[in-house]
Amino acid sequence: MANTKKTTLDITGMTCAACSNRIEKKLNKLDDVNAQVNLTTEKATVEYNPDQHDVQEFINTIQHLGYGVAVETVELDITGMTCAACSSRIEKVLNKMDGVQNATVNLTTEQAKVDYYPEETDADKLVTRIQKLGYDASIKDNNKDQTSRKAEALQHKLIKLIISAVLSLPLLMLMFVHLFNMHIPALFTNPWFQFILATPVQFIIGWQFYVGAYKNLRNGGANMDVLVAVGTSAAYFYSIYEMVRWLNGSTTQPHLYFETSAVLITLILFGKYLEARAKSQTTNALGELLSLQAKEARILKDGNEVMIPLNEVHVGDTLIVKPGEKIPVDGKIIKGMTAIDESMLTGESIPVEKNVDDTVIGSTMNKNGTITMTATKVGGDTALANIIKVVEEAQSSKAPIQRLADIISGYFVPIVVGIALLTFIVWITLVTPGTFEPALVASISVLVIACPCALGLATPTSIMVGTGRAAENGILFKGGEFVERTHQIDTIVLDKTGTITNGRPVVTDYHGDNQTLQLLATAEKDSEHPLAEAIVNYAKEKQLILTETTTFKAVPGHGIEATIDHHYILVGNRKLMADNDISLPKHISDDLTHYERDGKTAMLIAVNYSLTGIIAVADTVKDHAKDAIKQLHDMGIEVAMLTGDNKNTAQAIAKQVGIDTVIADILPEEKAAQIAKLQQQGKKVAMVGDGVNDAPALVKADIGIAIGTGTEVAIEAADITILGGDLMLIPKAIYASKATIRNIRQNLFWAFGYNIAGIPIAALGLLAPWVAGAAMALSSVSVVTNALRLKKMRLEPRRKDA
């Protein structure tokens, strides 16, 4: 191979020599490729002709065989971006780099997220490439105070704006002369006076536009800086030309446009300041989450209590938390009891009772008892840290609706420059032949009214504010695409156990005396069955003392037999009673039938062959489940229940909460197939679940929603996590999605509409340059301000017919 290139890839999933041989053989079948795969190092070294192949082709080949290629992710802070053309260009360049799998650049957060193959490239190369484009970039430091950095940058913008405004204000007086024929002192019309004020604005305050324009043009791109630099320079240097003519005596009344260039720069700086200030408010939700973290912890060392910084707490440390203090990290109580305010996590204002062996979550508030706990998760592994990570990823992700704006942003500035040149030519040749000034003014107006910034900000600002507001309410979207997909949902499928119900059986009905209950609970206390646990807890709530069982025997399919203090106990179904010649009074038989029809597990109790009681146990429906399902129905969404339970139990639960469609007797592995059936009917399906067996269905659904009290597997598989398990958050999540997408559409309509209408109006000469500049400055501000309305969004779903 004359022209060769070598690359190394880390391969995952190989288990034996057959795997490495298979990959090597497949790669070597490609033309002009020489590949060697090492099982020990788990690396593939590939020599190839870059004119025929690229690295992505090898990666696709390996992945098609069922193996993986190791990918690393880095987040970068980028400064110097002024509009969507900047972020679009950086993203395009990064995605063309060797070894980059995917890169997204967010103008609002001023960050890039890059997935790359570590054997092909590294974070330093990514940073260097961005810097070559003319922007400052660095690897994101999670320990760095981003808020203070942004505050300093905002303060710097304000200082520049004030200086620019002070210098431009006297020049602004000249506009009032043109508009209202006002009389002003002669000093203001003096060319030297105007030159002295306008020059520092143009070349000191406005130098950032020249630098940005130069860097972009040097790298074959164009952004807002190009438009501002060209537009203001045209006005400034034409004024210099007129001033030279005045000095030479060629004219006694030069037509100067110093005020146009200076006021334009001031207005644009004003718009950028307002935009930056508004953008800083979009990240408030993340700041509020970060502020919830405890700053220090009280650790028990050698019997002494010592206060240490939070980052010095390790897994296994013994911590003491007193009333009114925050739980420092995730852990388990080993001593004491208390009530914990978990509202920051679940939104539930009522404190939760906690005892020994109960789990506590970091950053929740200890209300009224001193507890000793063991740290189980610290640092980035805590529940709050994971929530913050999910919110950050969602806020920096892109929704599919943004693609059109990104495509247009890439071509926007060159097109606008072309329109401005065409405007100049048409004016000077056709509209006002031979007259330079009207052509110049119209073309400057075209340059400065065009605003790619509004296009670039339309989607990410709404996503940031919308996902932040949702997170404040306990709803975690894992990305912008899931925000967009959720608003299309027309069918929601709910798992029963742990989702609609609490997932733990409790005694719902008992008829009998305390002695019978005491004997029953004693008989059941050594059993690990959930129903037995419910009975024992019920007896303890009644403060009954449980004794010891003399004999115990399970009767498969029927119940149990036990001897306690010379009492012979039978607990079970009708068949067990019949086998022991115990007759059932009609009212007991009717009660039994009634409980079974309601989906409860009913048990008969006999002491010494005499029927003494009946008890019913059931997994109870969650608070607000019925209200949540009613809200979904009001929104025009079909609701179905999917469960492995028998049809009678499922129908009973469905009736309680108002669900019409019940899919029962389903094996765990069949759940995903049931979701697929609904999708084949053209439905957009969301699956809500909490267990390991729900994970395949969560992945198969258009949107997977995990209940936060569920397993990590379910949460990992889901697109949305509902913290705390309150079903009322499901309609709220859908409404948050609808409100966010509606806001994005409003922003895009304004951004496109503004440019579509503004550019022709400017080209027709109907706008003075300073008016065009003011409109451009305020267009992006209006987009961000509209997005900020989502901060006040009340997550109350609307009726479909409302």
From Swiss-Prot:
The chain crosses the membrane at residues 161-181, 192-212, 224-244, 256-276, 411-431, 438-458, 748-767, 771-790. It comes from the Bacteria. GO terms for molecular function: ATP binding; ATP hydrolysis activity; copper ion binding; P-type divalent copper transporter activity; P-type monovalent copper transporter activity. Cu(+) 2 binds at C83, C86. Its EC number is 7.2.2.8. GO terms for biological process: copper ion homeostasis. The keyword Oxidoreductase does not apply. The active site is at D495 (4-aspartylphosphate intermediate). It is an enzyme of class 7 (translocase). It is found in: Cell membrane. It is a multi-pass membrane protein. Pfam families: E1-E2_ATPase, HMA, Hydrolase. GO terms for cellular component: plasma membrane. Mg(2+) binds at D690, D694. Cu(+) 1 binds at C16, C19. Keywords: ATP-binding, Cell membrane, Copper, Copper transport, Ion transport, Magnesium, Membrane, Metal-binding, Nucleotide-binding, Phosphoprotein, Repeat, Translocase, Transmembrane, Transmembrane helix, Transport. It catalyses: Cu(+)(in) + ATP + H2O = Cu(+)(out) + ADP + phosphate + H(+). Belongs to the cation transport ATPase (P-type) (TC 3.A.3) family. Type IB subfamily. This is Copper-exporting P-type ATPase.
